[in-house]
A protein has these predicted regions:
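Mature extracytoplasmic or organellar-lumen-exposed domains after removal of signal/transit peptides
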Residues: 1-126
Length: 126
């Protein structure tokens, strides 16, 4: 609901599905970058930031993924897989004892998602 409210008040085009898709993939990428700093013994803020990015990606994904699926089902599957991996990496507000996802795997999935949308989203939208 907060995301929808912000989109309604945001700049023209903020609610465009391509822009929402780009924002979703950006949040997945940021969650991936936080993961290497988000384990036990690391600052808790890194984990919370990653969790926030993963949840923002989850909440913003439906409109962008539906839009992408109509154009390129394989690219949509790639983004959905990266999102699922991000949500697995950040299962809740407590840092897991053992990481569910290795940082290099998450970074690779995020990179694949960025590449998958690159021909559907303009550079300014990424």
């Amino acid at each position: 609901a907060a995301l929808e409210g912000a989109l309604a008040k945001g700049p023209q085009g903020a609610a465009d599905p391509a822009n929402r898709l780009a924002a979703t993939v950006e949040m997945i990428d940021r969650a991936a970058m936080q993961l290497r700093h988000a384990g036990k013994g690391e600052p808790y803020e890194a984990y919370l930031d990653g969790l926030g990015f993963a949840l923002a990606a989850r909440d913003g994904a439906p409109a962008g993924l539906d839009w992408l699926k109509a154009r390129d089902a394989k690219a949509a599957e790639t983004v959905a897989a990266a999102l699922a991996l991000a949500l697995k990496a950040y299962p809740g507000p407590r840092v897991p004892e053992q990481p569910a996802v290795a940082s290099p795997d998450m970074l690779s999935a995020a990179s694949r998602a960025k590449a998958a949308i690159s021909r559907h989203v303009t550079r300014g939208g990424m």
